[in-house]
Amino acid sequence: MKWNIQFDQDNGFLRAYQSGNFTSADQASFLSDIFSSQFWQTGLPLMIDYCHLDVDNIRYGDILSSSEFLTALNGSLGPGKIALLCDDDVQFGIGRQFQMIALIHLDREIAVFHSGRAAIGWLTGQHLAARTAQV
């Protein structure tokens, strides 16, 4: 599995890309690298882009361990939002499972999106659902 972490200066969020074949060990390293990157600040909005990640071998135990690993980093996260970008239905379903498990213990909102534009809008408060929720 490969990954890249970039700061989107125009929109003020961190974007982490993954590609290749999923492994739980790589996922833990990926999450660690996000929160130890030069760009990370507590409370920074985060988009995790799974569009180029092969998820065919992911099982429930992998989702659970990834969620537990993220929960252990809760103190580094701070309040804010995490958008999961998943461009196919299998990725989206796995993302929703991860969301439901992680939300139990995280102090952050998590949402899953098919569209990068919708994910960015939600992260930056420009998405219709974000505006409606603030009313």
Question: Can you annotate each of these PLM segments?
Answer:
Residues M1-V135:
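Amphipathic, Lys/Arg-enriched alpha-helical "gate/interface" segment within cytosolic domains
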